[in-house]
Amino acid sequence: MNKFSKGLLLSLALVYSHEILATERLVVWEDVGRASTIASAVKDFEKIYDCDVDVLEKPMYHQVELLEKQGPKGEGPDVVVLASDMVGVAKDKNLISQIHFMQVENSQYLPNSIASVTFDGELYSVPKTIETLILFYNKDLLKEPPTTLEEYVDLSKKLRKKGKYGLLAKWELFYTTYALMNGYGAYIFRTDNDGTINLNSYGLDTDGAVESLKVLRKMSKADLVYDCLSGVDGYNRMYELFSSKKAIAVINGPWAIEDYLKAGINFGITTLPTLPNGNPMAGFLGTKGYSISKWSTHKDLAEDFLRFINEHKNALLRYKESRQVPPVISVLQDPSLANDELIQVIAQQSVHAVNMPSIPEMSYVWSVMDKAIWKVIHAGLPIDHILEDARKDIESYIQTRIKNN
C-alpha cells in the first residue's frame, strides 16, 4: 500500500470516527427573558441524552416571521415558542410539524389548552403556560374582595367621591370587554365538532352581546370607565394608580405579577366577579407552547426535549421561577401548590375562559371590535346597530379573503 492510499484511508477513518462521535445539537428559540427559567432542565436533558441544546432568546411574537425567513435556508431553530394564535398561523404557512407523542400524552394537560393547539385532529404545540384575565386587589385596602360586578360598581361610586378608584380595567379593549360578553353567551365563531372554526357562525351581535354591552354603557355613564386608562399608556396608568393605593382593584393578566411584586404592593388574587345575570365573568384563555420547525433535522430529539421540559419536576420548577402557570394537570394538583393563589385562581378561571380562535381573520376582528367597543362607550348610538355594523364589516372581510384565496 503506497503512502497516498494510507493517507486516504487515515483521512476517511478520521472523518468516519468524527461522525460517530459528533453530538446532536438542538437549537431552541425561547422568549426574551425566559431562557433562565428552563436552564436547569436543559442541563439535565443534555446529560441524559448526550446532546447539546442551544437556547436563544427571540421575541415570541416575531418567531413565526423569523422562522419563515431562516427555516428554508437551514439557519433556523429546531424548536420555537409560540402563542396559540400564532401556532395556527405557523401551521397554515406549513412552518411547523405535528408533534406525535402529544397524541398519546395530551390527557396530561388541561383540555382547553390542548384544544387551542389542535388542528384537523393533530397537535402542533406542547403547551407551556396558560394566561387569562384575573382580578388583583390591594389587601391593605380591601380585606375581602366583592364577588359581584354590581358590588364593585357600588364601591367604585363611593370611592370616586373621595377622589379614588374602585375597579380598574381596560374596558375600551375588546380583549377585556369580551369577559362581559362571554358571560352573556356571546361568542366570536362557533367551533364544529371536529374542532374546525365555523366562520359562518358569528355570535358577537346576539341578544346576549347587546345585554352585556348595556352593562358596560351603564358603567360608562356612571363615570366608571376611565378615560385616563385609554390608549397605549393605559396599562402604565393603571399600574400607577394601583401601586400608589389610589385604586383598590384591577383586572389584568398574570403577566402583571412581576411588576406588582417589584412595586411592593400587598396584593391578593381572585377570580373575576359574577355578572348581573348570575354568570361568571370570563375572558380569553391564552396558551403559549413549544412547536417543532418543519425544517428541523432532529425531530425525534426535539420531541424528546419537549416531553422532558414538561415532565412534572421540570414544569413545577419552571413555574416557581417564572410564575407562568403550566397547564400540566399534575403540577396544578401538586400538594406544594395547594395554597398558591395564582395557581388556584388561574385553574378556576380557565374553566370558564374561551380559547382565542387561532385563525388569520382574528386580526381583523380585534380591530373592528375595538372600534365597536369605543362607540359603545363614547357614542350614543344604539348598541344593536353598532354590533350589526361590526358584523357586516367582519363578514365582508371574510368573504373578500375567501374570494382572493
Across the structure, where does each feature detected by a protein language model lie?
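Extracytoplasmic/periplasmic solute-binding protein
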Residues: 124-128, 133, 153-205
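Hinge/lid segment of periplasmic solute-binding proteins
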Residues: 84-134, 144, 149-155, 268-270, ...
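Glycine-centered hinge/linker elements that transmit conformational signals in sensory
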Residues: 156, 198-230
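A structural signal for short loop-to-beta-strand junctions that line the ligand-binding cleft
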Residues: 69, 77-78, 106-139, 166-169, ...
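Conserved N-terminal structural module of periplasmic/extracytoplasmic solute-binding proteins
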Residues: 20-87, 278, 336, 385, ...
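Long, aromatic- and glycine/proline-rich binding clefts that accommodate carbohydrate-like moieties
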Residues: 270, 319-371, 375, 400-403
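Extracytoplasmic/periplasmic substrate-recognition and gating elements
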Residues: 224, 261-324
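Short, solvent-exposed loop/beta-turn-alpha elements that line the ligand-binding surface or hinge
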Residues: 101-109, 187-211, 262, 274-283
